[in-house]
Amino acid sequence: MTETTAHPVTTATGTDVRVRFCPSPTGTPHVGLIRTALFNWAYARHTGGKLVFRVEDTDAARDSEESYEQLIEALRWLEIDWDEGEGVGGPHAPYRQSQRTDLYLDVIAKLTASGHLYESFATAEEIEARNRAAGRDPKMGYDNFERDLTEEERQAFRDEGRSPALRLRVPDTDLSFDDLVRGTVTFPAGSFPDFVLVRPNGAPLYTLVNPVDDALMGITHVLRGEDLLSSTPRQIALYHALIDIGVADAIPRFGHLPYVMGEGNKKLSKRDPESNLFHHRDRGFIPEGLINYLALLGWSLTHDRDVFSRMEMVTAFDVADVNPNPARFDLKKAESLNGDHIRLLALDDFAQRLVPYLQAADVVGAELTHDQRRMLEAAAPLVQERMQLLGEAPDLLSFLFTTADELPYDDAAVQALKDDAPEVLAASRGALSGVPHTQWDIDLVQEVLQNTLITGMGMKPRLAYGPLRVGISGRRISPPLFESMVLLGKDETIARLDRLAGMLGE
């Protein structure tokens, strides 16, 4: 075995950069996982390098094809694309770990033949007993005592019917690396023992296959979550061996991205609703808004600007600018940013994006009628400036797609009306009845109601218009009142005021 302490670290820059996104297909896509994908994508696009998409699907008990399909759906929705990997192909196929067993077995054979791996027969009980006998903490772990077993000693274990695990012979030196996010990180010699890479049944562990895949695929920069920081020295130790046997050319650069925190400054858990990417999509986040917010979980464009496009992110993104401190998922800020991006949409694009949410709430059918489409196009400008989530559309707009007879009234809105509401409705109906159909426009409707309620009855606008808003929309909050009346038309507006007046008079 050759000296293992002075192996080169990659110097790849620009188009030579190769990053990877290699999730396990378990559960629904987590915002922390997608943030990792986004940062890798942005770095690849910024440098002109390549993003490799690899699937780590070797946990048969937890992995599922359904989770894989959800992951693909999430990436496509956010327009995070990749240059090589599953679904795209490339020179290093296959890109699923479950299909790469022969490659791992070949590397294991080379590592064993070169002396980097050695057989370990010890049981957990025997390891604890050795630690006790030496006066050490029994839970201290393995003490490397099998490094230099003779062939006779190994054969004796085999004769007992034992099958060996394979451990990596860890260099007896400090292991340091320059983390792209955190600076120099050093693990002193002896920080961890020789560790198992292959189970006694011959199955390679994640600690082997992940770095081997990175090496075989020429990955130059490993950008991943902070939770994997502690495994990095083991991977570097393995890289020393992989370079020795010609599987790798250099050690990649590592960058460990900060935790995403939830409420109470606890790490965002898969059990937290905020962690579920599809939960945000279902509520009405748009890709542009969610991408922007995920980018802010550890990075920023400038100190005084939070709203930016994905292309602005690509232009500016450098992993060296990522903040190592934990990033808190602030739902209110995320929603506010999403609203900013909603207002940046072209009006016709915005209107079209509302349709699935209106359909899901049965406000409109699978196919919009001509009248429904015209109503949506006319109403969209009234709500675009007010919405933070597309999922607000049914509550804000459903009243425009029904009739006076079928309009549902919010009980709380009706009960909150003042005692003079019937008088307000009657006066408004009388005034509006005198407006000719041909002159039913915003200016005249507003003028008539203002003269009647504000000037004539001496009411404050909030109290005067409250019953009218409930009357036409069924709710306390709606798009602008006069514009809504014009969209509904004179007859429908008066019919709705009459219906509410009738309800209050019962």
Swiss-Prot record:
A motif ('HIGH' region) lies at residues 23-33. Keywords: Aminoacyl-tRNA synthetase, ATP-binding, Cytoplasm, Ligase, Nucleotide-binding, Protein biosynthesis. Its EC number is 6.1.1.17. It comes from the Bacteria. A motif ('KMSKS' region) lies at residues 267-271. It is an enzyme of class 6 (ligase). This is Glutamate--tRNA ligase. It comes from Clavibacter sepedonicus. The lineage of its organism: Bacteria, Bacillati, Actinomycetota, Actinomycetes, Micrococcales. The gene is gltX.
